[in-house]
Amino acid sequence: MKRTFQPSVVHRKRTHGFRARMATKSGRLVLKRRRAKGRQRLCP
């Protein structure tokens, strides 16, 4: 059985990156929540 986590920088950035978050309304809400909470890193 293969491991489920097969890391790829491209996939990570496109799915969870800052620009991906900014592209949708719900993504912007995610960033807003993380800013309000005081997260050091908003996106991976």
From Swiss-Prot:
GO biological process: translation
Gene Ontology molecular functions: structural constituent of ribosome
Organism for this UniProt entry: Acidithiobacillus ferrooxidans (strain ATCC 23270 / DSM 14882 / CIP 104768 / NCIMB 8455) (Ferrobacillus ferrooxidans (strain ATCC 23270))
InterPro entries in the cross-refs: Ribosomal_bL34, Ribosomal_bL34_CS
Any one annotated GO CC term: ribosome
Protein name as annotated: Large ribosomal subunit protein bL34
Keywords: Ribonucleoprotein, Ribosomal protein
Similarity comment: family membership: Belongs to the bacterial ribosomal protein bL34 family.
